[in-house]
């Protein structure tokens, strides 16, 4: 059975173009979402995935209607393949029921993995460069060294940690980490 999926990013957008293309392709059922593709909560897609069974073909108008990213799309199509479900994208001329379509998706999977590895590589290189220039990653410290010293003096003088935490707007656990209980 051919089962279609349409998605638009906002409620005021229209799915007619996608629906017409899927109807012309012979889809018997069409599921719909009116939500951004970056959102992981897509009720129409979830319902569609529960409905699909071995031998079915999931049909979309265009690849970007289904996946949030290339990596997400490749993972999703691989999960479908494991369940015996084919995938077809009308405008991209992809059909995983054919050897060429399956090959194309293997290539896409390799490209998605390479993209992920390149991002990791660039991130590491950027962090190394920043460290070499004396910059430290992460957020700025909540307190200056002088404020930490003052907080330590207050605790040493017997001020309850809860009160010091309120004064410096830090958690009590943060104070215990910085000034363990036995270190008064």
UniProtKB/Swiss-Prot annotation:
Residues 161-180 bind DNA. Residues 1-134 form the Resolvase/invertase-type recombinase catalytic domain. Its EC number is 3.1.22.-, 6.5.1.-. This protein catalyzes the inversion of an 1800-bp E.coli DNA fragment, the P region, which can exist in either orientation. The function of the inversion is not yet clear. Keywords: DNA integration, DNA invertase, DNA recombination, DNA-binding, Hydrolase, Ligase. PROSITE patterns: RECOMBINASES_1, RECOMBINASES_2, RECOMBINASES_3. This is Serine recombinase PinE. One of its GO terms (molecular function) is DNA binding. The active site is at residue 9. InterPro entries: Homeodomain-like_sf, Recombinase_CS, Resolv_N, Resolvase-like_N_sf, Resolvase_HTH_dom, SSR_resolvase. One of its GO terms (biological process) is DNA integration. Belongs to the site-specific recombinase resolvase family.
């Amino acid at each position: 059975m051919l089962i279609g999926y349409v998605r638009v990013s906002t409620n005021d957008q229209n799915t007619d173009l996608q629906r017409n293309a899927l109807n012309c392709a012979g889809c018997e059922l069409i599921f719909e979402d009116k939500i951004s593709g970056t959102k992981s909560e897509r009720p129409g897609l979830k319902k569609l995935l529960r409905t699909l069974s071995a031998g079915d073909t999931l049909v979309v108008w265009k690849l970007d209607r289904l996946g949030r990213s290339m990596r997400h799309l490749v993972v999703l199509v691989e999960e479908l393949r494991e369940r015996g479900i084919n995938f077809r994208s009308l405008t991209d001329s992809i059909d995983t029921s054919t050897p060429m379509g399956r090959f194309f998706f293997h290539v896409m999977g390799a490209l998605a993995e390479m993209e992920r590895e390149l991002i990791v590589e660039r991130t590491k290189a950027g962090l190394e460069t920043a460290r070499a220039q004396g910059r430290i990653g992460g957020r700025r410290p909540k307190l200056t060294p002088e404020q930490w010293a003052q907080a330590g003096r207050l605790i040493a003088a017997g001020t309850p940690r809860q009160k010091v935490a309120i004064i410096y707007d830090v958690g009590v656990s943060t104070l215990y980490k910085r000034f363990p209980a036995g270190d008064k």
